Amino acid sequence: MTTSPGPVHETAATTDDAALTFRGVDHISLTVTDLNVSAKFYTEVLGFTVVLDFGYGLACIHKTTGFTLSLIRHADGTGTRFSQRQTGLDHLGLTARNRAELLGWEQRLRELDVEFTPVRDSELGHHLNFRDPDGIALEFYAPNDRFAAALDELRSRTFSDEDLLDVAEQQLGLGAYVARRSS
């Protein structure tokens, strides 16, 4: 195993798969055609703050959530609009508290002349879809009460993979969609 040198307090990663995990999503980097236009959108519409400017890219922080968004303009980029039908990113989903908050976001998007699809309800919750200036698909999502309760239970303790599938099947009533693998 190769490890890179680091601070003295760091230790080499273990090969014990049970000990290896990640703690959440750290950041996302989006390729854009115009840094200024994209920075304006993400600061004015979603409340990000541009913190670093590398010339070719910007690092933006959302102060409330701590989420980091990088906007990158590649010198040799194609300049074409985003399509979720190509391999890669389908959309970026952002968390909302509930359906009422989504309706508030509808109003904000309307006031800022951002095109959106009205709030839609699904088996697991509610979503509001819109796009950034490059056509990158964005979504605000709020789980319904049943899914929120299941997520709270999942976060409260450790589950085996089989237990996790049981929660999806029983608590959410989504047995037809549960991805059970035959042994």
Q: Which residues does each predicted region cover?
A:
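Alpha-helix termination/capping residues and helix-transition junctions
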Residues: A19-F22, V45, Q86, E111-D113
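Short beta-strand/turn micro-motifs at beta-sheet edges
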Residues: T14-A18, G77-F82
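A generic structural signal for short beta-strands and their flanking turns/coil linkers
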Residues: Y56, F67, G88-D90, L112
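Catalytic cores of nucleotide-enabled group-transfer and carboxylate-activating enzymes in metabolic
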Residues: F41, L69, G104-E106, V114
